Amino acid sequence: MLAKRIIPCLDVRDGRVVKGINFEGLRDAGSILEQARFYNNELADELVFLDISASLESRRTTLEEVLKVSGEVFIPLTVGGGINSVERAREVFLHGADKVSVNTAAVKEPELISRIAEKYGSQAVVVAIDIKKVDGRYIVHTHSGKQPTAYEALEWALKVQELGAGEILLTSMDRDGTKEGYDNDSLALISTAVHIPVIASGGAGSLEHLYDGFTKGHADAALAASIFHFRQHSIREAKQYLRDRGITVRL
């Protein structure tokens, strides 16, 4: 059985790590480099760097920040925010990213997924899907969750898989920052329908929530921010907790 992954996420805005609730009310969560170094030494399996305002404000992810982070970590680094072309993806890879995460641009131009995958391989393409429950349906949103789309979550997940995505980063906007646990219903819906890895995101507030994301949501990886950024729990502690309960992790 493949080991389940624990992935801390650096939501970056104006050169700082931030964290909000339901994509709003951002508060400072520290220095980008300090957090990156910390997670590199904490047995994180990967690190995600998301410039959360890049697409919203139509500006590009700061390549200098990506370069600094990539020089500090020796674990796979996924970078997202404002990646709207193959050339932009190339720049991010040249600055040290191992994977790129596309979201808003992929909904606008789905073929972007295929073009990046054809050039760099599916393993280098993560499609971030932000969903919100609307009238009982999971609706995909873009522009940092500000704009609803015509896509339902399952429909879009199957489409991005077909287009060549190597992973799906599924974020519940309803749970984001709430520490109430992942939306395991939507996770299970997507995880059991696709054959590519699904990363759980949005709502982790305890070690039990990580466990539930793997066992109830059938996620392949768990992304978290609040519980790690503010040192509520360590990644080592989380992995030991999971291992003690029969989940295969790297320790």
From Swiss-Prot:
It is found in: Cytoplasm. InterPro entries: Aldolase_TIM, His_biosynth, HisF, IGPS_HisA/HisF, RibuloseP-bd_barrel. It catalyses: 5-[(5-phospho-1-deoxy-D-ribulos-1-ylimino)methylamino]-1-(5-phospho-beta-D-ribosyl)imidazole-4-carboxamide + L-glutamine = D-erythro-1-(imidazol-4-yl)glycerol 3-phosphate + 5-amino-1-(5-phospho-beta-D-ribosyl)imidazole-4-carboxamide + L-glutamate + H(+). It comes from the Bacteria. Gene3D superfamilies: Aldolase class I. It holds the Pfam family His_biosynth. Pathway: Amino-acid biosynthesis; L-histidine biosynthesis; L-histidine from 5-phospho-alpha-D-ribose 1-diphosphate: step 5/9. It is an enzyme of class 4 (lyase). One of its GO terms (biological process) is L-histidine biosynthetic process. GO terms for molecular function: imidazoleglycerol-phosphate synthase activity; lyase activity. The active site is at residues 11, 130. Belongs to the HisA/HisF family. IGPS catalyzes the conversion of PRFAR and glutamine to IGP, AICAR and glutamate. The HisF subunit catalyzes the cyclization activity that produces IGP and AICAR from PRFAR using the ammonia provided by the HisH subunit. Heterodimer of HisH and HisF. This is Imidazole glycerol phosphate synthase subunit HisF. It comes from Chlorobium luteolum (strain DSM 273 / BCRC 81028 / 2530) (Pelodictyon luteolum). The lineage of its organism: Bacteria, Pseudomonadati, Chlorobiota, Chlorobiia, Chlorobiales. The gene is hisF.
